[in-house]
């Protein structure tokens, strides 16, 4: 069996759309919330999520927050985010986080030039803003992570990973792009290179060192076709070293996908459970 990218992207997008819309609607109703707030970056994941949420509960119940740090956020991303909310008439706010980031200079160990801790700080600041707005209006925080990013742990813990629901969490990145086409998003958004923009010039595939098409091939083989890791190269044509790297990403980031661990005491069978 040879697996190609066509096997991954050839899914019934109409059924996926319907299922996700019902999921969003049900989760908001179950929580007895009034609406939804989404962090909109101008990329394909957040744009697709915004449109699906809008379809689920109506434009009037959705707010988009555009939160650039103008020193590192590409101007094009801001423009694309603004284009989208204006096209559909979605309520939005542009909140520059430059000064909020700078306020952390009160910490004696703060250094804005450290890309990873400062980049993650930007993601966590955005999470705080989203939850402040959600608490203020009794809204749900809708996450925009896709399945590829979740499985390899390519998100900030308690940053963009800090959300209430992940509507596109069952779609690989390549599928999200096709979903964007299906929903009528322009090519300038659906084909835009993935860019968290947590620091200047930050591009996902450059940081990962692997294209998403390759990542998705390997993840699809492992998780959907249940192929043993050592046999993935012969089924996908992906180099064994790349397969090993993707698998390592998944395993090393397991903690991001789980609740914080709790020690088991001899007299406590289940420290935390639902009743």
UniProtKB/Swiss-Prot annotation:
Residues engaged in binding ATP: 39-46, 144, 173, 195
A UniProt-annotated Pfam family: NAD_synthase
Alphabetized InterPro entries for the sequence: NAD/GMP_synthase (IPR022310), NAD_synthase (IPR003694), NH(3)-dep_NAD(+)_synth (IPR022926), Rossmann-like_a/b/a_fold (IPR014729)
Keywords, ordered alphabetically: ATP-binding, Ligase, Magnesium, Metal-binding, NAD, Nucleotide-binding
Source domain of life: Archaea
SUPFAM superfamilies the UniProt entry points to: Adenine nucleotide alpha hydrolases-like (SSF52402)
Residues the entry annotates as binding Mg(2+): 45, 149
GO cellular component terms listed in the entry, alphabetical order: cytoplasm
Enzyme class: ligase
Stored CDD domains: NAD_synthase
Catalytic activity annotation: deamido-NAD(+) + NH4(+) + ATP = AMP + diphosphate + NAD(+) + H(+)
A GO molecular-function annotation: ATP binding
A Gene Ontology BP annotation from the UniProt entry: NAD biosynthetic process
Residue numbers binding deamido-NAD(+): 124, 157, 164, 255-256
Assembly notes: Homodimer.
NCBIfam families cross-referenced by the UniProt entry: nadE (TIGR00552), PRK13980.1 (NF010587)
Function per UniProt: Catalyzes the ATP-dependent amidation of deamido-NAD to form NAD. Uses ammonia as a nitrogen source.
Family: Belongs to the NAD synthetase family.
Protein's UniProt name: NH(3)-dependent NAD(+) synthetase
Originating organism: Staphylothermus marinus (strain ATCC 43588 / DSM 3639 / JCM 9404 / F1)
Encoding gene, per UniProt annotation: nadE
């Amino acid at each position: 069996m040879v697996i190609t990218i066509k096997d991954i992207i050839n899914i019934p997008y109409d059924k996926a759309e319907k299922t996700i819309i019902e999921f969003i609607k049900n989760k908001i109703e179950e929580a007895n919330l009034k609406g939804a707030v989404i962090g909109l970056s101008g990329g394909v994941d957040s744009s697709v999520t915004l449109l699906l949420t809008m379809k689920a509960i109506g434009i009037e119940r959705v707010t988009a927050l555009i939160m650039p740090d103008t020193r590192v956020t590409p101007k094009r991303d801001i423009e694309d985010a603004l284009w989208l909310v204006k096209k559909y008439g979605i309520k939005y706010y542009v909140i520059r986080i430059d000064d909020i980031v700078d306020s952390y200079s009160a910490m004696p160990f703060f250094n804005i030039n450290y890309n990873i801790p400062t980049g993650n700080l930007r993601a966590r600041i955005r999470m705080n803003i989203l939850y402040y707005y959600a608490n203020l209006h009794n809204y749900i925080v809708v996450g925009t992570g896709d399945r590829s990013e979740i499985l390899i742990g390519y998100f900030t813990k308690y940053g963009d990973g800090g959300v209430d629901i992940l509507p596109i969490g069952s779609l690989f990145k390549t599928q999200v792009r096709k979903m964007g086409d299906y929903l009528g998003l322009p090519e300038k958004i659906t084909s835009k290179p993935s860019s968290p923009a947590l620091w200047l010039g930050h591009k996902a595939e450059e940081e990962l060192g692997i294209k998403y098409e390759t990542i998705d091939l390997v993840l699809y083989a492992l998780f959907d076709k249940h192929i043993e890791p050592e046999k993935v190269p012969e089924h996908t044509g992906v180099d064994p070293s790349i397969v090993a790297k993707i698998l390592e990403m998944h395993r090393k980031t397991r903690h991001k996908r789980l609740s914080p661990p709790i020690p088991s005491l001899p007299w406590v069978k289940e420290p935390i459970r639902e009743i």
